[in-house]
Amino acid sequence: MVIIHGESCSGKSKKALSLIDSTKKCLYFALDFDKNIKSLELQNKNLQVTAYPKGSFLVDLEYEILNHGGLFKNKLSYVVIDTINFLKDDKKNLPKFLSRLKRLEKEYNKFEIIAVINTLHHFELNNDFQIIEGVKFIETKKRKNKIIIL
C-alpha cells in the first residue's frame, strides 16, 4: 500500500498515476472528480475511472474487486483512491480506515492500493499513521506559483 499526501495542487494525482504500470489493469476511484482524471481513462485503456458516493465505500470497493474476478481470476494490479478525505475527513477515523484498506489488499493479495490524502495546513500526518505495517508514505510539495507581470 502506498499513501501519497500533500497539499492541494501539489501533484498527488499525477504522482499516483506515475506509480501505475500502464500495461496492467487499474481501478481509479475519483472521489474528488476532476475533468483531467476522466481524460486519463481515454488515454489508457487499462484504467477504469469510477466515481462513488461516500456512503458505503468499502462495500462498493469489495464489490468492484469481486466484479473483476475476486480471489482467483482477478486481473487488477492497482486500485487508486483519490482522495480519501472525501471518505474520512476526520483525523481520528482515518488510520482505522487505512488499516481496513490494507486488510483488503492483503486478503486478495493481487493488487496494490494507492491512496491519495489531501493534507491541509492543519491536517498533518503524525505517528498515528505510521502504525500500519507495510505502508509506504510519499509526500508531494506544493510548487510556488510564478507571477509574471507584463
What are these model-predicted stretches?
Residues 1-64:
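Conserved P-loop
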Residues 5, 29-30, 50-52, 82, ...:
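Conserved beta-strand segments of the P-loop GTPase G domain that flank and frequently precede/overlap
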Residues 9-11, 34-35, 55-57, 84-92, ...:
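Short acidic, S/G/P-rich loop/turn micro-motifs used as interaction or catalytic elements
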Residues 43-47, 71-72, 143-150:
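P-loop/Walker A phosphate-binding loop and immediately adjacent motor/lid segment at beta-alpha junctions
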Residues 61-74:
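Conserved alpha-helical scaffold flanking the Walker A/P-loop in AAA+ ATPase domains
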Residues 72-93, 112:
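Conserved P-loop NTPase "ATPase switch" module shared by AAA+ and STAND
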Residues 91-122:
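Substrate-engagement module of ASCE P-loop NTPases
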Residues 117-150:
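Phosphate-binding/switch region of NTP-binding enzymes
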